[in-house]
Amino acid sequence: MRTTIDVAGRLVIPKRIRERLGLRGNDQVEITERDGRIEIEPAPTGVELVREGSVLVARPERPLPPLTDEIVRETLDRTRR
């Protein structure tokens, strides 16, 4: 997918990708330069530990996108390379 960097160095992530990754305005991303390439990925979501009865439960600090079969397959494919 092709996009343009403006004169201020800003880059628009296409809507389809933002929606699939659950990214919204003001969300943070991690940018890495590796082997002459730019990698952009969602910044890790912080969690809050909440006690539910005798169990500690990790709750994300912001809503996360639903985990779909497609996301699981893509993640497995990426990690197996």
Swiss-Prot record:
Coiled coil: none annotated. Residues 1-45 form the SpoVT-AbrB domain. InterPro entries: SpoVT-AbrB_dom, SpoVT-AbrB_sf. One of its GO terms (molecular function) is DNA binding. The keyword DNA-binding applies. Keywords: DNA-binding, Toxin-antitoxin system. SUPFAM superfamilies: AbrB/MazE/MraZ-like (SSF89447). SMART domains: SpoVT_AbrB. Gene3D superfamilies: 2.10.260.10. The keyword DNA-binding applies. It comes from the Bacteria. Belongs to the VapB family. Physically interacts with cognate toxin VapC40. Antitoxin component of a type II toxin-antitoxin (TA) system. Its cognate toxin is VapC40. This is Antitoxin VapB40. The gene is vapB40.
